[in-house]
Amino acid sequence: MADIRVKICGMKTRADMEAAAAAGAAYVGLNFYAKSARSVTIAQAAALASDAPVGLAKVGLVVNPTDADLDAITGSVPLDMIQLHGQESVERVAEIKTRYGLPVMKVIGVAEAADLDPIDLYAQVADQLMVDAKAPKGAKLPGGNGISFDWQLLASKKYWQAPWMLAGGLTPENVAEAIRKTGARQVDVASGVESAPAQKDPDLMRAFVEAAQAV
């Protein structure tokens, strides 16, 4: 289905951005979480976002950001959306949305059915949701760990108040199955299109988008 929208997260170079656009991605992610190998500085992100191919929505990934963090990022980087990938409360999501005037995507980590319970509340304030695999205990990163969760958990949970995106261990080989099982209309990928840690592969990007849109 050509209306499946793909987000490729972890852009680090102009070549990454161009390859994502050429592959047909709708969104690209700029990672501001310093502990991640995919992270970029504000200066790097500003250069990438300012020169981004036309049509790519630029999403800034942050984890439990302070206002000072977001002031610095949004003051320099022309983002189209903020992705909150930490333990931000419903109230904090609403605050950020109001303060910065940008659409906000809230990530919900899922390992079991009970993890889906907060989604209805977040859907009332967030512009979009991302349903991702919950990071393993002790993991250094909140996402981008290349692990998935039981997609059947979403079989009867497809309709929330806000649009949502599926993430977690998706690859060109399994994204079609994930879409069929969950009904997702949007999917996110990072490690699944890398040939080495934090190294995006244009061929894998293209294969991923083609597989997603062929469902």
From Swiss-Prot:
CDD domains with a match to the protein in the record: PRAI
Transmembrane residue ranges: none
Top-rank taxon: Bacteria
Biological process (GO), any one: L-tryptophan biosynthetic process
Keyword annotations: Amino-acid biosynthesis, Aromatic amino acid biosynthesis, Isomerase, Tryptophan biosynthesis
InterPro entries: Aldolase_TIM, PRAI_dom, RibuloseP-bd_barrel, TrpF_fam
EC number annotated for this UniProt entry: 5.3.1.24
A Pfam family reported for this protein in Swiss-Prot or TrEMBL: PRAI
GO MF term (any one): phosphoribosylanthranilate isomerase activity
Major enzyme class: isomerase
Record-stated family: Belongs to the TrpF family.
PANTHER family for the chain: N-(5'-PHOSPHORIBOSYL)ANTHRANILATE ISOMERASE
HAMAP family reported in the protein's UniProt record: PRAI
Protein name from the UniProt record: N-(5'-phosphoribosyl)anthranilate isomerase
Source organism: Ruegeria sp. (strain TM1040)
Lineage: Bacteria, Pseudomonadati, Pseudomonadota, Alphaproteobacteria, Rhodobacterales
Protein's gene: trpF
